[in-house]
Amino acid sequence: MTYVISDLHGDLAGLRSVLEQIRLRPEDTLYILGDVMDRLPDGVAILRWLMACPNCRMLLGNHELMMLNYLDEPSERNRWQWFRNGGEVTLKAFLALPEAERRAITAFLRARPLQAELRIGEWNYLLVHAAPLR
């Protein structure tokens, strides 16, 4: 079975609830269409879980992009934009990690696509957090 969710925004309890409902098996695939972080406190924990989940596929959402923008260029403008959207809680949890783990999470995020194409039976799907690439 293929499952698609998005916009967890740091809600680890919500993710656990979804996992209980779907009973994700090794042969299933779970797509998460971005925005796993910010607003609620467990975005980094969700990222760590995704990094260890062999049958999970994560796409970038605008919140992950805001984080990467800030990490690339920690300007006041990028900080303000990210924090205005709930990023302060994520940055605090991220900075509490050892440097090696921060690098691993950053590399994981940089390797995530913005969209994915999926074929199930005779149907084609374009998975994306917001608007498709042009």
Predicted regions and their residues:
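N-terminal active-site segment of His-dependent metallophosphoesterases
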Residues: 1-47
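Generic structural signal for short, solvent-exposed loop/turn connectors between secondary structure elements
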Residues: 1-2, 23-29, 51-57, 97, ...
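Residue-level marker for buried hydrophobic side chains located in beta-strands
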Residues: 4, 32, 58-59, 126
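Short, solvent-exposed loop/turn segments at secondary-structure junctions
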Residues: 9-10, 38, 64-65, 131-134
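Conserved hydrophobic/aromatic beta-strand scaffold that supports enzyme active sites
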Residues: 26, 115-117, 127
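Active-site neighborhood of divalent metal-dependent phosphoester bond hydrolases
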Residues: 40-118, 122-123
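Short, well-ordered beta-to-alpha junction loops that form the rim of enzyme active sites
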Residues: 121-123, 128-132
